[in-house]
């Protein structure tokens, strides 16, 4: 049975051994559900129906089924930080996105059979390590050049935020997707399109009669201008792809060593915490657990079982 790793697995190994053992060895995640992940997952499901040829109504019904009940129970629409994840905000944004950007208007053609494609591709000649993931759309074909690309949907609080676009310049996920697609299909895959959808709070929902300083009219009349969607092309040189593979195999070996060295919860106090040195503790899901001293007897209270397949997408 080969060792299977996703991009998120390798990224976690690169950041912190403790987070790696917790997430992938002991299969634990932070208690509670992340609104960003919950909304992002629902948007992905909505787009899957849309890109596979479903109607706008069918796509929005999927969004409602996956997100409405949870959002209404967990999100305060007036909350300064979480309000953008309210059901009404997500519903309005996605309803407009589907109306404004039909699949037929994209600069490439989409094969419905190549939407939401799971893959497991051997990283090594022996086949003992496989890279796994889910491509939101594989082998889309540019209408003008006839070249092939992949597509990855991304939701974010701010497309124009200083950190959003730069994360893809050297990021491993798109390089890994590109390498995997080139291994899977006979056609030459040129790059990956990031379909970025901004899930920021629409000002219209807070005060529809307030006048917009940018458009000179009430927010209720210009709210659609505040929906931000961008299609961003990511490309890599041949050397960058080769270097990625070398690094991916090295991190996979380190991952294997961690699982073998620290197989039980009782080993947690001995696992290295590199995050203290590289800053990854700041946004880590396990920060509270580690700050409390990694209490093994509190593991079941401070964390919860993790759904493995959710890792494939990131």
Each predicted region: which residue ranges?
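Metal-dependent nuclease catalytic regions and adjoining charged, substrate-binding loops involved
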Residues: 5, 167, 179-314
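Nuclease catalytic cores
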Residues: 10-53, 91, 116, 280-286
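Active-site-adjacent bridging/hinge elements
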Residues: 16-22, 147-155, 254-257
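Hydrophobic/aromatic-lined pockets within catalytic cores
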Residues: 26, 48-55, 102, 123, ...
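Conserved aromatic-histidine-acidic binding/catalytic patches
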Residues: 31-35, 39, 82, 125-126, ...
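Regular secondary-structure segments
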Residues: 44-55, 252, 256, 260
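A non-catalytic, helix-rich entry segment at domain boundaries
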Residues: 46-118, 122
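Non-catalytic protein-protein interaction segments used by genome-maintenance enzymes to assemble
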Residues: 114-175, 179-181
């Amino acid at each position: 049975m080969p060792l299977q790793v996703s991009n998120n697995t390798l990224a976690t190994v690169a950041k912190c051994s403790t987070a790696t053992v917790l997430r992938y060895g002991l299969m634990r995640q932070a208690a509670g559900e992340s609104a960003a992940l919950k909304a992002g997952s629902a948007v992905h499901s909505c787009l899957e129906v849309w890109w596979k040829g479903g109607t706008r109504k069918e796509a929005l019904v999927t969004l409602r089924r996956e997100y409405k009940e949870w959002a209404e129970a967990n999100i305060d629409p007036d909350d300064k930080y979480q309000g953008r994840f309210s059901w009404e905000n997500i519903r309005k944004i996605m309803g407009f996105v589907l109306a404004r950007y039909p699949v037929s208007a994209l600069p490439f053609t989409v094969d419905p059979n190549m939407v939401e494609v799971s893959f497991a591709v051997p990283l090594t000649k022996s086949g003992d390590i496989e890279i796994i993931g889910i491509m939101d759309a594989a082998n889309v074909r540019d209408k003008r050049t006839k070249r092939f690309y992949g597509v990855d949907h991304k939701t974010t609080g701010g497309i124009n935020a200083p950190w959003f676009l730069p994360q893809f310049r050297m990021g491993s996920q798109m390089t890994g997707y590109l390498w995997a697609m080139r291994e899977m299909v006979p056609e030459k895959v040129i790059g990956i399109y990031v379909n970025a959808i901004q899930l920021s709070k629409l000002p219209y929902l807070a005060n529809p009669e307030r006048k917009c300083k940018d458009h000179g009219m009430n927010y209720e009349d210009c709210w659609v201008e505040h929906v931000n969607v961008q299609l961003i092309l990511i490309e890599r040189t041949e050397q960058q792809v080769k270097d990625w593979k070398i690094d991916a195999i090295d991190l996979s070996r380190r991952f294997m060593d961690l699982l073998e060295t620290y197989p039980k919860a009782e080993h947690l106090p001995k696992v290295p915490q590199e995050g203290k040195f590289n800053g990854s503790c700041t946004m880590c899901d396990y920060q509270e657990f580690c700050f409390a001293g990694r209490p093994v007897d509190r593991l079941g209270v401070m964390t919860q079982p993790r759904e493995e397949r959710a890792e494939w997408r990131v």
